[in-house]
Design a protein with these regions (language model features):
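Rhodanese-like catalytic fold shared by cysteine-dependent sulfurtransferases
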Residues: 1-19, 26-57, 66-97
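Short, surface-exposed ligand- or partner-binding patches at beta-edge/loop junctions that are enriched
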Residues: 61-62
């Protein structure tokens, strides 16, 4: 079972103690993102997976939460402590605006 967190709880986390993987496309990421997050668009997932450090818990989101759930499964299979942010950016932005 994939670990999940609500967008509301995610925005309350201390971002300096976690790794954030933002799977939105580069243009969306450049418009707004969390400082220190890693942008790995869905289209470049396999090329970017090796850039994710394992030292901290990893929180992953895409635009809606679908692709990030798939990425969390793959990261867990590779030994990461990974969590999917439910609802993705569409939900997150409700709590940061």
């Amino acid at each position: 079972m994939v670990k999940e967190i609500s967008a509301q709880d995610f925005v309350k986390l201390d971002k300096t103690k976690i790794t954030i993987v933002d799977m939105r496309e580069e243009t969306e990421y450049s418009d707004s993102h969390f400082e220190g997050s890693i942008n790995i668009p869905v289209s470049k997932f396999w090329a970017g997976i090796d850039n994710i450090p394992k030292e901290k818990a990893v929180y992953v989101f895409c635009n809606s939460g679908y692709f990030s759930e798939e990425m969390v499964i793959l990261l867990e299979e590779r030994g990461y402590d990974a969590t999917n942010v439910l609802g993705g950016w569409k939900e997150i932005k409700k709590f940061i605006i």
